[in-house]
C-alpha cells in the first residue's frame, strides 16, 4: 500500500501504522501517499 499512487486515507487498513505524506513533486503535487514512519 506504499507508493506515490496510493491515496492515503484513514479508511485504508493498509495505511495503519504508516504516516500520510503530501508530495511536493511536480507530477504528484499535493498528492498523498503512505510511507513508513521515520
From Swiss-Prot:
Expressed by the venom gland. It holds the Pfam family Toxin_22. The modification Serine amide is found at residue 38. InterPro entries: Toxin_22. One of its GO terms (molecular function) is sodium channel inhibitor activity. The keyword Disulfide bond applies. Its main location: secreted. Disulfide bonds join 1-15, 8-20, 14-34. GO terms for cellular component: extracellular region. It is found in: Secreted. Coiled coil: none annotated. The keyword Membrane does not apply. Keywords: Amidation, Disulfide bond, Ion channel impairing toxin, Knottin, Neurotoxin, Secreted, Toxin, Voltage-gated sodium channel impairing toxin. Negative results: has no effect on lepidopteran larvae when injected at 20 pmol/g, or on mice when injected intracranially at 32.8 nmol/g. Insecticidal neurotoxin. Shows competition for site 3 of insect voltage-gated sodium channels (Nav). The presence of a 'disulfide through disulfide knot' structurally defines this protein as a knottin. Belongs to the neurotoxin 14 (magi-1) family. 09 (magi-1) subfamily. This is Mu-hexatoxin-Mg1b. It comes from Macrothele gigas.
